[in-house]
Amino acid sequence: MSKQQITSAKIRQPSGHFSHATMVEARGRIVFISGMTSRRADGTIAGIGDIEAQTRQVCENLKAAVEQAGGTMDDICRVDVYVRNMEHFEQIHKVRREYFRPPAPASTMVEICKMTSPEYLIEINAIAVIGE
């Protein structure tokens, strides 16, 4: 699979670790990954009150899902990020840089008021394209 970052001088450069657009030329499978939270496999919640720890667990959960489908984090082309506090933007992108090599996936981040558990600070869903 070939993934390419799309940029334009007509659009302000991203302020975080994401691409304006991501183009994929591939024959393969599209994988839609549900919203991942900081819940570990044993049911406990990682990093209660710690956005970096929660973001890291979310990324580990994304990684486990995409790897189970036969891909890698490099195959993730799009993420939607839901946060309880937009002031965590820099901390979240610091962790994302550890998991997403350039070209970073296209991304939307929105602040929401509630999640399925009051301890959750972040949730991310993703789309991956896994080449043959």
What are these regions (language model features)?
Residues 1-132:
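Short, polar/acidic, helix-capping and beta-turn segments at strand->helix junctions
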